[in-house]
Amino acid sequence: MKNSINIQDQFLNQLRKDGTQVTVFLLNGYQLKGYIKGFDNFTVLLEVQGKQQLIYKHAISTFAPEKNVRFETE
């Protein structure tokens, strides 16, 4: 059986490793701009203006990085 590719984890991990600033759009319309410091199956740890915020993934609509993310899909 071929391993399935988890694009979400690859995308978030590359943003974290590169230190790319990202705008996180929440379902309620609120926007947070910061850096991804970590993530798991349910949450994303975002550093915003030197402070940490733990965001539940079910509250997130979109991640918009300030530059394109390069990662392997195969």
UniProtKB/Swiss-Prot annotation:
A Pfam family the protein falls into: Hfq
Keyword terms of this UniProt record: RNA-binding, Stress response
Domain Sm, chain residue ranges per copy: 9-69
Gene Ontology molecular function terms on file: RNA binding
Keyword RNA-binding: yes
CC per GO annotation: cytosol
Disulfide topology: none
Oligomeric form and interacting partners: Homohexamer.
This protein's name: RNA-binding protein Hfq
